[in-house]
Amino acid sequence: MRASGILMPVFSLPGPYGIGTLGNEAFAFVDFLAAAKQTYWQILPIGPTGYGDSPYQSFSAFAGNPYFIDFRLLAADGLLTEAELPAPQPVGPVDYGALYQQRPVVLHKAADRLLASPTPAYEAFCEAQSGWLEDYALFMAIKAEQEQAGLSDWPDDLRTREPAALAAAKERLADEVDYYKAVQFFFYTQWNALKTYANSHGIQLVGDIPIYVSPDSSDLWTRPELFQTDGAVHLTSVAGCPPDAFAADGQLWGNPLYDWPRHEAEDFRWWKQRIKHATSIYDVVRIDHFRGFESYYSIPAGNTTAAGGKWVKGPDRAFIDAMHEALGQGGIIAEDLGYLTPEVKTMLAASGYPGMKIMQFAFDSREPGNYLPYTYTRNSVVYTGTHDNVTTEGWRATASPEDVHYACRYLRCTPKDLTEAMIAACLSCVSDMAIIPMADWLHLGAEARINTPSTQGSNWQWRLTTPLTSLLADHIADLTTLYDRAPAAE
């Protein structure tokens, strides 16, 4: 079925408390999507973030980001007083340092009220999520006690989960463990309410999960045997991407690599649990760096660039078969951008999952692949660009004149109209799903870029300051209907 949606991170929503949340503005965005005749709201990973603020480097593959908890909803539930709500702030770029200092103070007050008289809903949540929640809460409590030191810098007995040290920590940090569990209850209560509202208005949530976990995560700490580590939970190899036209030294991500033979020996149980969790909170799940299941780029731990890495064979079809067994064949988007061998293409075809097409890449002379629209298939998802791309207006301003000229010739438009023409090319193409970033619908420039890979500084900070008008919703709805992507009338 042809359909379309909008890419909009939760943190980019407007709102009074320094970052987008799961409150009024998220519900209003659902209303906007419905008015614009969209079917999907695609977001970025929603896990708790740490150093670098990247949603792709989370403390847990299962937990939710406390920054997204809406204080006004907590007040409505009687967990905060009006006097305890922070003063409203003008909408501007996310200041993660300020959030780190200010948010826990408010959340502790709400958690104390809940824990003084735990509700049946809270107790049921803790029981249902015990498979990851207990370890995550203890991990975060120890991390706080260690002054936020990364896992690799923890004392040996805590890092390696020596039983006596673990038991002592559970007793010593019992109150903080309860706090982190309460915060997760707040997050998932609000998340589930938003998802219910979205689904009731015909909007499906497209989630995003990184293929790898963070080196500073409860996942690595809890099950180090599932990763390429030594006996002391130190990484022996790390993840990344080889050098290419976009990054001369490649990309050194630094994530733990999986011990795939161990996963296969366990029938991929951890991955099945992860995907089942994701499909319980999202309607569709995009898996980042899907090609890493066929073969992955391995860099010796301690290297300062990705240039010295090598490709290593992954689980390939065995993983795909396990996912089909657990979930069937639907509900997954495979992020298949970058270097694709025939073996990767064979694996993707066997999965049945749609891959991704990036319209900007079609006209980028640095891109070796062919992303021109005539190459697309129905079983694919097309984007003007993703969170890793500059906005289309930004691309027009920064791409080579030759590339812009080629795009305008191909799309039969002037440079001034390039963004609208590229959006139309996405909506009109054969791909079953088309996703347009919110910033492109607003014709925003490079100031609205979400992330520049392999850089630090101003990533993951963009927030929406432009009003989403009924006029814009009508324009989007008109194009969506024109290209036969509007939901069927009830």
Named regions from a protein language model:
Residues 24-49, 277-282:
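Catalytic domains of carbohydrate-active enzymes, especially glycoside hydrolases
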Residues 35, 158-159, 165, 462, ...:
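Domain-scale activation on soluble regions of proteins
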Residues 180-213:
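Conserved, well-ordered alpha-helix/loop/beta-strand core segments that scaffold catalytic motifs
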Residues 1-11, 27:
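N-terminal regions that are enriched for targeting/export leaders
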Residues 34, 191-199, 324, 348-349:
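Surface-exposed amphipathic alpha-helices with a cationic face
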Residues 24-31, 189-197, 271-273, 418-422:
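Short alpha-helical segments and helix-capping/turn motifs at coil-helix boundaries
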Residues 9, 53-184, 188, 213-435, ...:
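Alpha-amylase-like alpha-glycosidases and glucanotransferases acting on alpha-linked glucans and related
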Residues 44, 204-206, 210, 284, ...:
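Outer-envelope exported proteins of Gram-negative bacteria
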